[in-house]
């Protein structure tokens, strides 16, 4: 507010000479009337003027005091308004930080959800492939059961008809016997190979006919043996042992695929759990969790009045300058039994698990305060509570 200047204008009185000079000239009757009053009238006028002056001065003092008070209140209001502006600015800064944190968390959550969707799609595809494999295995088992039930295999072997000549000369038969490969010679039994001594001996017509019959018989036996071998091969291919081996192989392959899928699912689950734990530690810090845990324990104790009270003694130090007070609180109760820790050998798998846990604890330690500072804070708060109770 601006300073207001007050101008006091005094009204002229009829008794003063200023009034006679400024006003109109009085008549002769009025002049006589003015000349008539004695010294008593002039004294009364002076007293009334003094009283009016004192009143005006007191009013001026009051007005000046009110103006000063208004100025003081205005200055206090300006200071409060400046403090309010600072508080509003700090609140706006914290709100902007909170918005940024929420944006980052929403981005991480959206990325996690996308990864979870991809994992679910992969799991669905793996399940579909496993179901298809199971259907194929069932079909194979059904076909195998039908084949084992039948156990009768009819194999048709088609061969070109070889027209053998009615008569063969000994020279041709000898040439053919010499031209036979060693492999075919191994297949032939005893008595099938023609004797080498016949080349040197001249044979008669009866002996030539006998040699031709022996050659024809050897060829027929060879064809029979090759057919029997093929039938044996087919039987071996569709035998019980081979079918059982194929069953065992298919089962082993199925078990391997199932184990691989289980391992992959467990790995994905572990990775998701790790990421969710990291996100949880980011959203809810360790201090907050400890506070929630202690509050839960206190609530449980409050609802269970018969809980065990352990004996303890605490020393709290608090300073009231220029004094320092050491307060020792002793609580009676049962002696707390500390659990003994056992040393356990750690293997390579435990080392991996310990490394993962160490990473998690390192992340937690980065944001958690020291234990000593927490204990000092609790002791100071307990000391303040004791002071308040003593003062009450």
From Swiss-Prot:
Record key words, sorted: Acetylation, Cell membrane, Coiled coil, Cytoplasm, Endoplasmic reticulum, Isopeptide bond, Membrane, Microsome, Mitochondrion, Nucleus, Phosphoprotein, Repeat, RNA-binding, rRNA-binding, Transcription, Transcription regulation, Transcription termination, Ubl conjugation
Glycyl lysine isopeptide (Lys-Gly) (interchain with G-Cter in SUMO1), cross-linked positions: 163
Region (Disordered): 1-45, 173-197, 347-367
Sequence similarity: Belongs to the CAVIN family.
Protein name (Swiss-Prot/TrEMBL): Caveolae-associated protein 1
Matching InterPro entries: Cavin_fam
Region (Nuclear export signal), start-end ranges: 54-64
Region (Leucine-zipper 1): 55-77
GO biological process, one term: termination of RNA polymerase I transcription
Sites of Phosphoserine modification: 21, 38, 42, 48, 120, 169, 171, 173, 177, 204-205, 302, 367-368, 381, 389, 391
UniProt GO MF annotations: identical protein binding; rRNA primary transcript binding
PTM comment, free text: Phosphorylated. Present in active and inactive forms. Changes in phosphorylation pattern may alter activity. Phosphorylation at Tyr-158 is essential for its function in the regulation of the ribosomal transcriptional activity.
Source organism: Mus musculus
Free-text comment about domains: The leucine-zipper domain 1 is essential for its localization in the caveolae.
Residue numbers bearing the Phosphothreonine modification: 40, 198, 304
